[in-house]
Each structure stands twice: as C-alpha cells, then as structure tokens.
Amino acid sequence: MPPKNEKDLYIKIGEALKSIRKEKNLTITDIHAMSEFHSSTISLIERGKQNVSIGWLIHYANILEIDPTEIFLRAFKDDFQEMQLQKMYERFGTYTPESDNDENS
C-alpha cells in the first residue's frame, strides 16, 4: 500500500536503512565511526523519527557501499509490487475462463 503520509515515508526509508546496515553486519556505532553522523541521528532516522535529505541518503549509501537506489527499492518494494499488480489488472481487466468460453461459442 502506498505511503499515506510523510511519516510513513520516513518509517519505510528508516526500515530499509536499518535492514541494509544489519545485512552488512554493521552497528550504529560502526556507522558513526565511518562517518560524521551521530549515533543518535542514525537511530532517529532508522526509526522514522527524523527526515533526511537526498544528499544524506547518497552519503549513507556510499558508506554502506551500495547504490542509493537500493534504499528506495527496499523501502517501497511492496508499493512497487502493488503498482505492478494494478497495471496488470488494468491491462487484463476482469478476465475469467468463462468469458473466454463465451467468445469462442
């Protein structure tokens, strides 16, 4: 489901950042040591409690050695899948096997 408000966006981005950091076996303290980011700021962002700029996300992605788009792909994966399903539904309409049989009769 697409984010309902700005807070939902922050939460999804924060969850993605935390997930990627943990996959890399890094702690918040590790990130702090690798950057100028304060541990408390990282924690707030990962919990969706603080807004971030695109520049901040790009810098953070560089620290994690990932492409910045990975953050957004993770954060909005479910939304992208839902949009794809909606496009398929719009393209194929309400196809049922019965409607195909009706056309062949």
Predicted features and spans:
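DNA major-groove recognition helix of helix-turn-helix/homeodomain DNA-binding modules
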Residues: 53-70
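Short, charged recognition helix plus adjacent turn
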Residues: 2, 72-105
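The alpha-helix within a helix-turn-helix
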Residues: 21, 32, 61
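A short, Lys/Arg-rich alpha-helix, primarily the initiator
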Residues: 1-23
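Short alpha-helical DNA-recognition segment
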Residues: 25-44
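Helix-turn-helix DNA-binding elements, focusing on the entry/boundary residues of the two helices
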Residues: 17, 28, 39, 54-57
